Amino acid sequence: MKRVIYIITAILMLVSCSQKIGYNSVDANKFAAIIQKANKIQIVDVRTPDEFNEGHLPGAINIDVNGTDFAEQIKKLDKKVPVAVYCRSGRRSKLAADQLVNSGYTVTELDGGIISWQGEIEK
């Protein structure tokens, strides 16, 4: 009986570890290609407003993932239009991507954040 429980536990652990994260995490080149090719895309910078004002991707809107109203603000996004999300280094955008996916959005996340971005920056 113990052996059966051990085997079932091992299988469950393997299955849970192999589940997908629910969004695409891509490097800066792929992220640039995605936002350039898309007919419509919502680019969301999840850094603080001060960080956003220092420079952001062209066309990006700012919704601070650590803001108290983040969940309310993302409701304003169109669920029919893909979301491209980024932050400074990739940690906050991964948190935001999880929340967006759980809310029903299709999400691509910039792995490495804006510090990995080689394209145009808007101020």
Regions found by a protein language model. Give the residues of each.
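Sec-dependent N-terminal signal peptides
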Residues: 4-14
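Structural scaffold elements adjacent to functional motifs in cytosolic proteins
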Residues: 43-45
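Rhodanese-like catalytic fold shared by cysteine-dependent sulfurtransferases
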Residues: 2-4, 17-41, 50-82, 88-123
